[in-house]
Amino acid sequence: MRPADVGRQAALLSAVSVYTVLAGAPVLWVAMMSLRTTSEISAAPYGWPSPPHWGKYASAWTTSHYGTYFWNSTVIVVSAVLALTVVGSMAAHALARYRFRSNRVVYFALFSAIIFPPQLTIISLFQVLVEYGLFNTRLGVSLVYVAIQLPLTFYILEGFFARIPQDYFDAAKIDGCSEMGVFWRLTLPIGTPAIATTVILNLIELWNEFLYAVVLVTDDDKRTLPLGIMRFLGDKLEDIGMIATGMMIAILPVILVYAFLSERLIRGMTASVLK
């Protein structure tokens, strides 16, 4: 190996190492704080948990109602992601494969929704949910999550589906497949990498969503995990130890999902480039 190549590899490894430390250090710090009490953290913010208080997780799950918040987040996010996958893939398939007069108008209308900041839609969504009796309900929050993530889901899937060769669809039609048959038997199997990408991105984004949830949910028994964590941070109460425990409970599912599906995510994000 030439000296220049060795130098480039050393520089690349150094950059990756620095990034890993910068990205991982805050997570490690929160993990250590999650095993310490607030008084211990106040006395030594960067101290090692000795002894580690593992019982804090059980207490957070039951006494602090994190179990309820976790269930609410799971129901809302999973239902929203399922709806996004079905509706987004069908819409992307329709606009990618079938050309009609207003095809591009619909495309740019959906794409433009990605550009606008979410604060612009909060008031209108609040009024719609109140009007239809969906304010302060899990269903209402789930529908809002579908609305805010659908443009990005559609954009990713449409770009992938549009690159599927037309010959595949012609062959499926010759074999007797209906329009829905083409979608279920051809588009979905081929588009699995892109669909997996949208599922992971939507899970991560919606699991950590706070802005819409804090406006649209008022009852404590309907709070999501981000709202539940904020209960321990206020003017009269600041339980840093329990906040750290709640943060670890919140991020563990995201870490597990990414660990198991990261290969599909990378493959899906690069598939359209390699086509």
Residue spans of the language-model regions?
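A structural signal for multi-pass alpha-helical bundles of membrane permease subunits
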Residues: R8-K275
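Short, Lys/Arg-rich, polar N-terminal cytosolic tail immediately upstream
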Residues: M1-V6
